[in-house]
Amino acid sequence: MDQSFGNLGAGAGSSSGGSNSKAAATAVSSSSFLQLPLSTASPAYYGAPLALLHHAAAAPSSSQQHQQQQHHHHYARHGAEMSAAEAEAIKAKIVAHPQYSALLAAYLDCQKVGAPPDVLERLTAMAAKLDASAAGRHEPRDPELDQFMEAYCNMLVKYREELTRPIDEAMEFLKRVEAQLDCISGGGGSSSARLSLADGKSEGVGSSEDDMDPNGRENDPPEIDPRAEDKELKYQLLKKYSGYLSSLRQEFSKKKKKGKLPKEARQKLLHWWELHYKWPYPSETEKIALAESTGLDQKQINNWFINQRKRHWKPSEDMPFVMMEGFHPQNAAALYMDGPFMRDGMYRLGS
């Protein structure tokens, strides 16, 4: 059932109310109480009388009663089966229910969300009257009506929460922005002073006798530099974050040159170099271990050893015999690709 609170019960199936249920459904079409979605489990029998709750909440006058009579005539013209007496009886049964005041209070709470102050005051006064008139309501137990009243009270409470959530989120956002602005400006004093200066002319601050020249003419207010606010904001930002900016500047000035390895990694590579100076060609397994210990990748390690051998290592003349000691086949590829004898050793010896 996709209806509004003003159309409660319209188009619903038959219920335990019998003929009253069909009559209640026809009394809904031209009345409106709340434009709210309904639960499909709500009974149809008590749907139509809720279209009259809005009138009961505001103490109906004779003109309102006359308007209700016009509604009944309108229903009769369209073949409605509910008489005015039946509608009043069902309405009286709902009004006499102990939860009737809670239902109207929940409805008024929905109306209060985002309402202007004057409307909020009137709604609060109306809610106070409802609380005063709530005492003394007694009605025989009617499980169907009890279920209906409880369901719609809960629905209105949830609807009010949905209405309030975006407003609360907006207020929280504004508070955060205000706190950030106060933090940037070093407090609310300077911003308040700027606002007072900007609004001073419109509030008549410059119309006192102190602002009059000897000829009786009003002195013009001093000109305000439009960039003064930006300068003040810049000053406040520098004052607050100068230490952080200086540390960043020092960090950038100490930034390593491109391609230079970290000191700790170079020390570990040099340590391995000293231990294997006679044959400084690490195997693939040793390269993986060095990469894990230094935090470098394979390419960095390969480049470091190539450059290190070019600059600081020269094989001796008897190297072809010495290097066979502890030599294993996987180093042959590295020996060939690196070409130590062609580039560093034998080439220079033969040149």
Curated annotation (Swiss-Prot):
GO CC terms of this entry: nucleus
Ranges of compositional bias, category Basic and acidic residues: 214-229
SMART domains assigned to the protein according to its UniProt record, in alphabetical order: ELK, HOX, KNOX1, KNOX2
Pfam families referenced in this protein's UniProt entry, alphabetically: ELK, Homeobox_KN, KNOX1, KNOX2
Compositional bias of kind Low complexity: 57-68
CDD domains cross-referenced by the UniProt entry: homeodomain
Protein's UniProt keywords contain Isomerase: no
Keyword line: Developmental protein, DNA-binding, Homeobox, Nucleus
Disulfide bonds: none
Location in the cell: Nucleus
Annotated region of DNA binding: 253-316
Gene3D superfamilies reported in the protein's UniProt record: Homeodomain-like
Region (Disordered): 1-23, 57-82, 187-229
Domain ELK: 232-252
One Gene Ontology MF term: DNA-binding transcription factor activity, RNA polymerase II-specific
Role summary: Plays a possible role in patterning the placement of lateral organs along the axis of the shoot. Mutations in RS1 alters cell fate and causes unregulated cell division and expansion in the leaf. Probably binds to the DNA sequence 5'-TGAC-3'.
Family, per entry: Belongs to the TALE/KNOX homeobox family.
Name used for this protein in its record: Homeobox protein rough sheath 1
Encoding gene per record: RS1
